[in-house]
Design a protein with these regions (language model features):
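P-loop NTP-binding core
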Residues: 1-257
Length: 257
């Protein structure tokens, strides 16, 4: 059965979408079958996968609200070599429409129930807010991966996020776990980065990935070219870091790399 991982943080600009597409591409490069679900109305994961969000025939809105069959919604041609459920502005409307339907919190879970066995990993790019789309992601997921910058107030924000995840788990998914905490945009020359990193390891132990994602120009440039970093510059520090993260995740799952 494929593992479903929600990638979430209530704070924007922490590398959530970057992590989603680059981790997915790295997993796909290890011959795993991967699906990315873009639940962020901005559609950044869609565009960074080389898919024009203005040209797609169907989006996550159709999957969640219209209950369009999965095979009519999924995009199989992406630059990251993973499958994709795209997002566009209409995903914002899904928030309103879902309020009107029965079992609105588990629409995504139900939609994935018949296809999750077709994938090794399903990564969900969540919106940077707590709404019905995020709740659907949490209800469907086995675990939550939290990307976070090593910056001032990071620990305070993380405490609030952990509390939110705990409350959601109690209501919609009692089996939901923390997959791991990922340090992003890390600069080893910055004393604050090192101090926050040390505090994270002190408080959360082995939940903090050993892999660290550095600040990297090529990693930041890649989405504007519609590619994950490994297909934009495979020798960049960012591309190598996400390949290392994929390997670390597989080892945690005791899956041969």
């Amino acid at each position: 059965m494929g593992k479903i991982v929600a990638i979430a943080n209530q704070k924007g600009g922490v590398g959530k979408t970057t992590t989603c597409i680059n981790l997915a591409a790295s997993m796909a490069a290890t011959k795993r079958k991967v699906l990315v679900i873009d639940l962020d109305p901005q559609g950044n994961a869609t565009m960074a996968s080389g898919v024009d969000k203005y040209m797609v025939d169907a989006t996550a809105y159709d999957l969640l609200v219209e209950e369009t069959p999965f095979d009519q919604v999924v995009c199989t041609q992406t630059t990251g070599k993973y499958d994709l459920i795209a997002a566009y502005g209409d995903v914002t409307a899904a928030e309103i429409k879902l309020m009107e339907v029965f079992a609105r919190e588990v629409r995504l879970k139900n939609a994935l129930s018949t296809v999750r066995d077709n994938y090794d990993f399903i990564f969900i790019d969540c919106p940077p807010s707590l709404n019905l789309l995020t709740i659907n992601a949490m209800a469907a997921a086995d675990s939550v991966l939290v990307p976070m910058q090593c910056e001032y107030f990071a620990l305070e924000g993380l405490t609030a996020l952990m509390d939110t995840i705990s409350k959601l788990a109690a209501v919609v998914n009692e089996n939901l776990k923390i997959e791991g905490l990922l340090r992003t945009m890390y600069d080893p020359r910055n004393r604050l980065s090192n101090e926050v990193s040390d505090q994270l390891k002190k408080h959360f132990g082995n939940k903090v990935y050993r892999t660290v994602i550095p600040r990297n120009v090529r990693l930041a440039e890649a989405p504007s070219h519609g590619k994950p970093a490994m297909y934009y510059d495979k020798y960049s520090a960012g591309a190598k870091a996400y390949l290392a993260l994929a390997g670390e995740m597989l080892r945690r799952e005791e899956i041969p790399v």
